[in-house]
Swiss-Prot record:
Keywords: Antioxidant, Disulfide bond, Oxidoreductase, Peroxidase, Redox-active center. The keyword Oxidoreductase applies. Its EC number is 1.11.1.28. It comes from Corynebacterium kroppenstedtii (strain DSM 44385 / JCM 11950 / CIP 105744 / CCUG 35717). Belongs to the AhpD family. Disulfide bonds join 130-133. Transmembrane segments: none annotated. SUPFAM superfamilies: AhpD-like. PANTHER family: ALKYL HYDROPEROXIDE REDUCTASE AHPD. The lineage of its organism: Bacteria, Bacillati, Actinomycetota, Actinomycetes, Mycobacteriales. One of its GO terms (molecular function) is hydroperoxide reductase activity. InterPro entries: AhpD, AhpD-like, AhpD_core, CMD-like. The gene is ahpD. It catalyses: N(6)-[(R)-dihydrolipoyl]-L-lysyl-[lipoyl-carrier protein] + a hydroperoxide = N(6)-[(R)-lipoyl]-L-lysyl-[lipoyl-carrier protein] + an alcohol + H2O. This is Alkyl hydroperoxide reductase AhpD.
């Protein structure tokens, strides 16, 4: 099991992350597609080869090809959007009405349930630190019926995956 490989590779100081990874992978708060789509999208957002390959192997047992592609799409489009919208926010009100002018069709044409894609986008935006995108995607998923607990489950997955990536990077540099 790829997730077990990931957990076994973590050092002792990352024991909490290992436990969180195990607990979150068994979560019943989200549907299977939401859970593993969020795991895969956030893994891709870390830009860590080990995390991406191990989570992809595990996620492929739970997701259709459409969901795998959508998860990678969420990570990719949000990498662009999070930079652009953070910059727009940093630049202030003078830029509020400036048209973004970037293509982002995948958000509405991902090939999967809209709420599931939006949840992945929210989790990736959390990792990328974009306040405006995180809030916008949260508004969408809650208006589509997800609960605050479901939203925060995705946030916990994002936080844990980012922490695991950090530990792996630390160990690679030691």
């Amino acid at each position: 099991m790829a997730l077990d490989n990931l957990k076994e590779g973590l050092p002792e100081y990352a024991k909490d992350l290992k436990l969180n990874l195990g607990t979150l992978s068994r979560s019943t708060e989200l549907s299977e597609q939401q859970l593993w789509g969020t795991f895969l999208a956030t893994a891709a957002a870390t830009r860590n080869d080990t995390i991406i390959s191990e989570i992809a192997e595990e996620a492929s047992q739970h997701l259709s090809d459409e969901y795998v592609n959508a998860a990678y799409g969420a990570a990719s489009i949000m990498a662009m959007n999070n930079v652009a919208y953070r910059a727009k926010s940093f630049l202030g009100s003078d830029y509020a009405q400036v048209r973004m002018g970037l293509r982002m069709n995948i958000i509405n044409k991902s090939g999967i349930d809209k709420v599931d894609f939006e949840l992945m986008a929210l989790a990736v935006s959390t990792i990328n630190g974009c306040h405006d995108c995180t809030k916008a995607h949260e508004k969408t998923v809650t208006s589509e019926g997800l609960t605050k607990e479901q939203v925060f489950e995705a946030v916990k997955i994002a936080a844990t995956i980012q922490g695991v990536a950090q530990a792996i990077q630390i160990e690679a540099a030691r």
